[in-house]
Amino acid sequence: MNAPADRPQPRFVVEFGKDGTPPAEAGRLDAPAFHRNHEAIWQTLAPYLAAARGAVLELGSGTGQHTVTYATRTPALTWYPSDLQEPHLVSIEAWRTHTGLANVASPQRIDLTEPGWGWTPGGALVAMLCINVLHISPWSVSQNLIAGAGRFLDRNGRLFIYGPFMRDGTHTAPSNAEFDASLRARDPGWGVRDTRDLAALAAANGLALVDIVPMPANNFVLVFAREDRTSKT
């Protein structure tokens, strides 16, 4: 059944491109940002995940398009998408059903504002992935995401975070500074995060920021690993 084209959507969804189009059949959403960034992000993920086995947890999966796209390329991995917003959970399940991928689990609701958040079925993760979340969420989400990586990543696991970031207190482009100001004007708890602050969070949780990979449109992928496994192999 098609959802009404004028169905109200969450405020940040409309404004920050987590979906951007009316739901298609069964609630599938299509995010313009996905089409712009998924291949560039994959170039960073591929060396770690293309031949890996195990479980990957995506936090803030949005429409679900990244999950199903990357799951298609990694048949030996089981992907666990998650989100907090109900329209996103519906969309993720719709994309999972539409693609018929056996290695994508049903989406689960995870609230990263909760310090002790967990995931189902639990256990060690090969990787965690978080795309375009930290700048449109309170600082506690950054804290709890990285703390969760410290709890759940296996010995060789990686946490990948994509989005705009400051570098050592400096914006990487005037447009990012303007974007940051607009975010903080809308919600003082939002804003472009600084890699220096995220690295400090990582160190407090037994992790290290091992790579900062430039992406198109002044974005980056940050790669975190356990402090005793800081090589990129």
Where are these regions (language model features)?
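Class I SAM-dependent methyltransferase Rossmann-like catalytic core
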Residues: 2-51
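Conserved beta-strand signature within the Rossmann-like core of class I S-adenosyl-L-methionine
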Residues: 156-165
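Conserved Class I S-adenosyl-L-methionine
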Residues: 172-196
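Core SAM-dependent methyltransferase catalytic element
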Residues: 207-233
